[in-house]
Amino acid sequence: SVGANSIRLAHYQHDQYFYDLCDEKGIVAWAEIPYITVHMEGGRENTISQMKELIAQNYNHASIICWAISNEISLQGVTEDLLENHRILNDLIHRMDKSRVSAMANLFMLETDSSLVSLPDIRGYNLYYGWYVGEMEDNDTFFDQFHKEHPDTVIGLTEYGADSVIS
């Protein structure tokens, strides 16, 4: 247990000032490229370029613990081209930065045994129990079942629904 606050800098690269604040305040940060919702064949070079830039520009920020490959990318299904692009990005992360891990935020409807979700070092799930589906307590059930099936896998809650906020 690190005992630190964390933030997911989701969906796009953020201003250097914010990364500086995370370093200064000791906030653990998840950095992510804007590879979201739908995989576009022919967009591979763009995603590679964006990942290279994200890592090169932010490598020296101590607050960053992971480089995230994508967010909810499986909305239109998992294709071989999508898988190959994720393999390339995952390998690129590990070549450019051997001190940090790769991560990905997965759509809550994606099966936990999908070949896509096992690629990065950290699996994040955007769960909307208590908003789109089910009850808020279903978050507990999901994570308990996942941990039982995958006790050595690093997992996190990367998004949750506005109506499921505990007040």
What spans do the regions from the language model cover?
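Phosphate-binding active sites in nucleotide-utilizing proteins
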Residues: 3
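Substrate-binding/catalytic cleft of secreted carbohydrate-active enzymes
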Residues: 6-167
